[in-house]
């Protein structure tokens, strides 16, 4: 028996040679972490984006488009300036830099997710981990912010960043989007666009890029209403889950229906489970095989700074193992609360009650006669600040005064008697809440690569992409049996007819018919239409199936409708 062919190398060659994708800036030696999509790759990428767009639109979500460049203050508010970092280490001999956690994991075979820079440095020293390039000594570990920094405007006085996610453009527009949704929760907003992360050492081809495409939806909902109204439609869908407890105990995956997963407490509620099913169905619709999809729950130390719980939809790769393609995160009220605090904007939603309620609330203000001499010109400002506090903060103040008898506000030490505190009853017809957010976040580039890998079929006499038919970059190839009249003219006329009918179609008369069939099989074209010597006699052609290689004869008149049925199921 011969050696098993290296599927990865075969696919890389096919992608470069046939116009799917290749490393950027080739004539200048390339730059890691950047990829160009060729004519066929760009078409498949667009089709993936469209599948996701249609799925979001079926849920009634609105589409938005916002700038890639964002002022620094947005990312200060979102926490990215402080927390969007990776641990970095440098070789003291050759100057090469690496992800510290990756180097340690490769050297020791252990998971170091969540360890501090000091703990990572200690592991490097204890195990004498050296530079993988030259064997030199490694520096201490420090943190490196992954955002690309830029200057906005000609004076360079306004710092900005290329966005590391599309989500923040949605959050900062919440006030307008809420008005557009007529103040009615839940509602979803999505954006498809570029994101940028200055990865320390991008590897694994298209799986870790510095510039990539995302399709993110932010679903705003009332945290007290977490039952999805349409959950019954998806409750019997099976999900392959790898929850936290199974990872910690090495128990492997489990398969449950969405309903069972919620009842057993693996998925927090039906709202979350509904969108996990939606994500699975999108991956299937793209053409990812069901047995290559699973959902892995992120461990607490893995989760992003904004996440309360995250499940990753992962797709299996023969070369790279399980690869995260979609993250489904409960972001809570993190983003809207942070932007409210930093911007001063009101990003709440008024929830109306069915019946008015009587509620008790605290009124807290300063005793201005008593504190006036102490606070002087600041008295009025601090009094207004305290009165603007929410109920939770006012009750916190009362609790501190009860325990300690004093509190410091804006640098002034104030005693219990400096305040006027009353509990009052009030009839209210609704309340303002900060909505919570559930976020399904699709990468586009990873599903693109994994779709090709999982579609690649290697046979003795041919290698071809067994793409889902409606995902093929070229849907139909029109081929005259030989490049002679009248076959050429008839074939070209059919080609133009199919173009006008909306198919992605090519005309090709070069090489033998057998070579042409293999050429279009290789790139995933599901059907070749052949114009042969019978065509001038009875106006029929053959349709050849890529997967079975079988051919059927149909009339030229019925050809568009037959192809539409075969490719799109219409």
Swiss-Prot record:
Keywords: Aminoacyl-tRNA synthetase, ATP-binding, Cytoplasm, Ligase, Nucleotide-binding, Protein biosynthesis. It is found in: Cytoplasm. It holds the Pfam family HGTP_anticodon. Substrate binds at residues 99, 165, 212-216, 439-443. One of its GO terms (cellular component) is cytoplasm. Transmembrane segments: none annotated. SUPFAM superfamilies: Class II aaRS ABD-related, Class II aaRS and biotin synthetases. Catalyzes the attachment of glycine to tRNA(Gly). This is Glycine--tRNA ligase.
